[in-house]
């Protein structure tokens, strides 16, 4: 298993802090958020990490992470234009090859780490495991609907009508079958390849897509 850490984006909502650094490098308790993300990746035993970078901030990320040896990781840098999370996976295909992988945002840390998610994904032989959390403003997120067994049956990006409050928070685990789904989707109205569309396509194709709901 590999990891794909998304460290692109311009961080416009965090300006002026992001005029001189990537948003993933903003410190929390004197440590960049990206450092915590890499801590969690390393704790799973994963060794190979692809870091998606943006043209504007990629060098800042490289200067901090370097070769990844600080975390006992081997890091490949993958430049990408901001064309959606599924496009990031598509861009990273040469690095990912046929391996399963954890994908997480470089500015987003889960309180319980990644180990339990990796264990569930591998034990149940899943094609996708999507981490969800209840939110109070579902119209601002991608929202998932589940069946009684915890399988995801439908995903909608920023729904205009009520369909629950289980939001996608930016942590995903995929088998190589995600590439088949990405090959079938088209850009959304905003010109991006959406990861929600790719996951929905996996569901439509009959792949095993489950959810894990965070309680904290």
Enumerate the language-model features and the residues they cover.
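Conserved N-terminal catalytic core of the sugar/cofactor nucleotidyltransferase
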Residues: 2-5, 13, 26-27, 31-105, ...
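Active-site glycine-centered loops adjacent to acidic/histidine catalytic or metal-binding residues
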Residues: 9, 107, 134
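Alpha-helix/helix-capping structural signal
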Residues: 9, 56, 176-177
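Short alpha-helical oligomerization interface
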Residues: 19-24
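A structural signal for short hydrophobic beta-strand segments in well-ordered beta-sheet cores
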Residues: 25, 144-146, 211
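Catalytic-core segments of class I nucleotidyltransferases/pyrophosphorylases
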Residues: 102, 118, 122, 151-216
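Conserved donor-nucleotide/metal-binding helix-loop-beta segment in metal-dependent transferases, i.e.
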Residues: 112-140
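Ligand/cofactor pocket segment of small-molecule handling proteins
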Residues: 136, 140, 145-154
């Amino acid at each position: 298993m590999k990891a794909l850490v998304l460290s692109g984006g311009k961080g416009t909502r965090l300006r002026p802090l992001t005029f001189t650094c990537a948003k993933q490098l903003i410190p929390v308790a004197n440590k960049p958020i990206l450092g915590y993300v890499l801590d969690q990746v390393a704790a799973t035993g994963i060794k190979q990490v692809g870091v998606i970078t943006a043209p504007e901030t990629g060098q800042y990320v490289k200067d901090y992470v370097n070769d990844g040896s600080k975390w006992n990781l081997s890091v490949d840098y993958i430049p990408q234009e901001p064309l959606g999370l599924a496009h990031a996976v598509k861009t990273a295909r040469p690095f990912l090859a046929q391996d399963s992988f954890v994908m997480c945002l470089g500015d987003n840390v889960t309180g319980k780490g990644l180990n339990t998610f990796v264990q569930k994904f591998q034990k149940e032989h899943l094609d996708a495991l999507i981490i969800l959390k209840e939110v109070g403003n579902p119209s601002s997120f991608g929202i998932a609907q589940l069946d009684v067994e915890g399988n995801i049956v439908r995903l909608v990006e920023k729904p205009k009508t009520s369909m629950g409050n289980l939001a996608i928070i930016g942590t995903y685990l995929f088998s190589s079958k995600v590439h088949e789904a990405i090959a079938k989707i088209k850009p959304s109205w905003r010109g991006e390849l959406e990861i929600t569309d790719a996951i929905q396509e996996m569901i439509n194709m009959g792949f095993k897509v489950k959810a894990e709901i965070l309680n904290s």
